[in-house]
Amino acid sequence: VPALIKLFRDSSKIVRETAGTALICIGQPSVNPLVEALKDKDFVVRCHAARALGGMTTDYQIGRTWVRDANVVDALIATLKDPDRAVREDATIALGMIGDSRAIDALLEAMKDGVVKRHAIASLGMIGDPRALPAVLDALKGKGIKQEGTPTPGCIVSEDAFIKEAAATALGQFRDPSVIPDLIMLLKDGVLREKAAQALTVIGDTAIEPLIAFLYDPKASEVEAEGERVLSYASVRLTAKDALRLIVLETLETLGWSPPAEEVQISSSKADNLRVDRPLGDTGRFGPSGDVAKSS
């Protein structure tokens, strides 16, 4: 074990990660040496110690089965105050991978640290303790997020979208039906709708009826003019309204709901036009002005 921990100082990332995987496979005998490594002077060693304790290697979550020692959780909680941001990030994620609810209060406090906020939210979702639900829901609604400048439609210009993505994913992991309305409304957001849809499918069957109600309520499923303008930039995209309808139908189908035949025909024909993976040259147009692309 000591020899493997020494490899955390190796210049090769592959060597360092392989050493971490080996320590995880060794199991319980690695715990105390790794906890001690969290205090090492070298921040790289501290990072890899945190990752190993959380099972954060190419074999994600294999650490969950054996790292349940209270000393591990306490040591990682203390590491949330590390002066190096990378170490704090790794410790935050490790606590989520371990999945011990004793870390809830510390992770809620870590949400105040802008550097690790989205990781703290993700970890709270992995743990799934309902005590954290209100704070994660607040993050989804943008509370406590600092943003400078005016966002450009359709573009990510701050940490805001990343935090909301983490919050949407985490809300699904709580599997609490009370968040379904918030996730459904998030489907209107062109950037975040995929995460919201995934979260709804994780919550399960209880999301079906609210989604159907949303689908057939013209007022509820209205798209703001700005959103329509953003999604109409590229001629190969659906209108914002059609894109919203399509994601709702796809989510319902994933949940096992069979739409009426006419809806299937509509969604299929619309989907054929939503080819965002096509090279720009295939359509000849790009950008808000629809300028013609010319071959070089």
Language-model features: where?
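Terminal, low-structured helical/coil segments at or just beyond the last alpha-helical repeat
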Residues: T254-N273, L280-G281, K294-S295
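Amphipathic, positively biased hydrophobic alpha-helical segments used for protein targeting
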Residues: S30, A110, A207-P210, T251, ...
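Structural detector for internal amphipathic alpha-helices that build alpha-solenoid repeat scaffolds
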Residues: K6, K13-Q28, E36, V44-R68, ...
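Alpha-solenoid HEAT/Armadillo-like helical repeat scaffolds in large eukaryotic proteins
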Residues: A3-S11, P33-K41, A75-P83, A106-G114, ...
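N-terminal compositionally biased or targeting/leader segments
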Residues: D74, D105, P181, D277-R278, ...
